[in-house]
Amino acid sequence: MNPTLKLAAALVAGLVAAQAGAGDADIRHGRYLVATSGCNDCHTPGYMMKDGDVAESEWLTGDVMGWQGPWGTTYPANLRLLFKDMDEKTWLARARAPMRPPMPSPSLRAMRDADLKAIYRYVKSLPVKGAPAPAYVPPGGKVATPYFDLTPKNLPPMAGK
């Protein structure tokens, strides 16, 4: 192989390795954000009740435990299934859009694009697993699953209302 070809091959190999390393760093950062931002609290079955002692192989597979409040009853999506056919641009738009409670939409909207992309890349790195979450139930609808009741009770009257 001539010297110019060797140099070109070495440069290409270095670029590929650098890109792979950057991808791995994004995935590690995404895992960190998922672990520290509370994503597992709702999107991983049993995570809160087991004080986080859930294998990573079960993370972000959604849950049948609902969250009920004045908005109705919502369920944490199986993010692995959700992201399966979603591109990064769609994820960024969805993360910036309002979502039903108790999803902390303001927290997602406050994240930098780089952080949201890292979360996306981490979730995409996980094998697709699990079933879709149950469908949203509007206020007053029949709920067939266990759920947490987040309906405010005994609130004092609001000033000016």
Language-model segments: which ranges?
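Flexible coil segments in periplasmic/lumen-exposed cytochrome c-class electron-transfer proteins
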Residues: T36, T44-T74, S105-K161
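Peptidoglycan-targeting cell-wall enzymes and recognition modules
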Residues: G72-D87
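A structural feature that tracks compact, well-ordered secondary-structure segments
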Residues: R80-L82, A93-R94, P106-S107
